[in-house]
Amino acid sequence: MESGKMASPKSMPKDAQMMAQILKDMGITEYEPRVINQMLEFAFRYVTTILDDAKIYSSHAKKPTVDADDVRLAIQCRADQSFTSPPPRDFLLDIARQRNQTPLPLIKPYSGPRLPPDRYCLTAPNYRLKSLQKKAPTPAGRITVPRLSVGSVSSRPSTPTLGTPTPQAMSVSTKVGTPMSLTGQRFTVQMPASQSPAVKASIPATPAVQNVLINPSLIGSKNILITTNMVSQNTANESANALKRKREEEDDDDDDDDDDYDNL
């Protein structure tokens, strides 16, 4: 520590000499050399803040200049904000006595650190795991069949219509393509029956194929081509021939009835 006389030579600025004199008047004779610089910086910052606040108060009061009342108000507000005095000792003792009268929670006798419950400790987890949302099951009366797309060939299911079921010809052909891994998967192709205008209800029809199950393990790395035809040409020709024969039989029966009527 250096004395104040050694820290304030004649070469010091006037502000530094004044700060050294203030310290000497307060009975501070020993201090470090940089204490004067810190005190000067604090005084400059404090005075600048007070004058800025006084200018704001003066403009708010619509005064042409800053007067002493504005400076006093700024000093009072700054003192209440920055230089708050601690509460008295007796007041702190009363608060501490009331706080200590509250009993601490009981510690459960178990192995581990002897700490109060988690809600009284800062070590309790402050997060909660989010539960996974389960998807709603599909209703039993409604089955959604996705669009089948294997390679470059696709088959889109259509909505089934009410009517007389008609036979459908289905051909499944395979062609070599890019290898695919289809192990453990199973595809369902739904082909609903539709009514054909060329066939009447009096002709018995073969039940149509509704579902075709394809096991990829039997196919391997091949593409699947599924094509459906409404009614084959042979079935249409047979139906037309049956109708023609029925009409001829009806015409023959009519001719026989006419001959019998003439004979009578």
Swiss-Prot record:
Disulfide bridge partners, by residue number: none
GO biological process per UniProt: box C/D snoRNP assembly; chromatin remodeling; mRNA transcription by RNA polymerase II; negative regulation of apoptotic process; negative regulation of proteasomal ubiquitin-dependent protein catabolic process; positive regulation of response to cytokine stimulus; positive regulation of transcription by RNA polymerase II; positive regulation of transcription initiation by RNA polymerase II
N6-acetyllysine, modified sites: K5
GO cellular component: MLL1 complex; nucleus; pre-snoRNP complex; SAGA complex; transcription factor TFIID complex; transcription factor TFTC complex
Region of interest called Disordered, as start-end residue ranges on this chain: 150-174, 233-264
Subcellular location field: Nucleus
Bias (Polar residues): 151-174
Modification type Phosphoserine: residues: S149, S152, S155, S158, S181, S196
Function, in words: The TFIID basal transcription factor complex plays a major role in the initiation of RNA polymerase II (Pol II)-dependent transcription. TFIID recognizes and binds promoters with or without a TATA box via its subunit TBP, a TATA-box-binding protein, and promotes assembly of the pre-initiation complex (PIC). The TFIID complex consists of TBP and TBP-associated factors (TAFs), including TAF1, TAF2, TAF3, TAF4, TAF5, TAF6, TAF7, TAF8, TAF9, TAF10, TAF11, TAF12 and TAF13.
Name of the molecule in the record: Transcription initiation factor TFIID subunit 9
The organism of origin for this protein: Rattus norvegicus (Rat)
